Amino acid sequence: MGFQKFSPFLALSILVLLQAGSLHAAPFRSALESSPADPATLSEDEARLLLAALVQDYVQMKASELEQEQEREGSRIIAQKRACDTATCVTHRLAGLLSRSGGVVKNNFVPTNVGSKAFGRRRRDLQA
């Protein structure tokens, strides 16, 4: 008995599904009315060309802005040395500091009796 009540519903649902499958949504505009700039109507090659043109225009715009900025700054650009933290660079910086300070550093230090001449003179003085 349940099958008799179920069969009209099954037949009706099959007909509805068949009709729904055969219906297709119509486009809002025809292909002739659509603009060529619409991304849905562009082919893959056209989209690549459009993207390349946009990128090229952007790069040219940024390059011209950079040139204008450099012209405005002009002589304000100052060359700076790289920072270096190796032992050689630190030694050079300390040597420069000592040479710039001049006699101030020499007065603060007690002279030592070291060097190539100091040891040689002692030996000669002892032998003589």
UniProtKB/Swiss-Prot annotation:
List UniProt keywords, sorted A-Z.
Answer: Amidation, Cleavage on pair of basic residues, Disulfide bond, Hormone, Secreted, Signal
Q: Does the keyword Signal apply?
A: yes
**Sites of the modification Phenylalanine amide?**
119
Molecular function GO terms recorded: hormone activity; protein-containing complex binding; signaling receptor binding
Q: What does this protein do?
A: CGRP1/CALCA is a peptide hormone that induces vasodilation mediated by the CALCRL-RAMP1 receptor complex. Dilates a variety of vessels including the coronary, cerebral and systemic vasculature. Its abundance in the CNS also points toward a neurotransmitter or neuromodulator role. It also elevates platelet cAMP. CGRP1 can also bind and activate CALCR-RAMP1 (AMYR1) receptor complex.
Q: Which residues form the propeptide?
A: 26-80, 125-128
Where in the body, by tissue, does this protein show up? Expressed in spinal cord.
Naturally occurring in which organism (per UniProt): Homo sapiens (Human)
Q: Which GO terms describe its biological process?
A: activation of adenylate cyclase activity; adenylate cyclase-activating G protein-coupled receptor signaling pathway; amylin receptor 1 signaling pathway; calcitonin gene-related peptide receptor signaling pathway; cell-cell signaling; endothelial cell migration; endothelial cell proliferation; G protein-coupled receptor internalization
Instruction: State the disulfide connectivity.
Output: 84-89
The UniProt entry's coiled-coil ranges are: none
Indicate what this protein is called per its UniProt record: Calcitonin gene-related peptide 1
- Keyword RNA-binding in the entry? The reply is no
Q: Which GO terms describe its cellular component?
A: cytoplasm; extracellular region; extracellular space
Family designation: Belongs to the calcitonin family.
Q: Which SMART domains match?
A: CALCITONIN
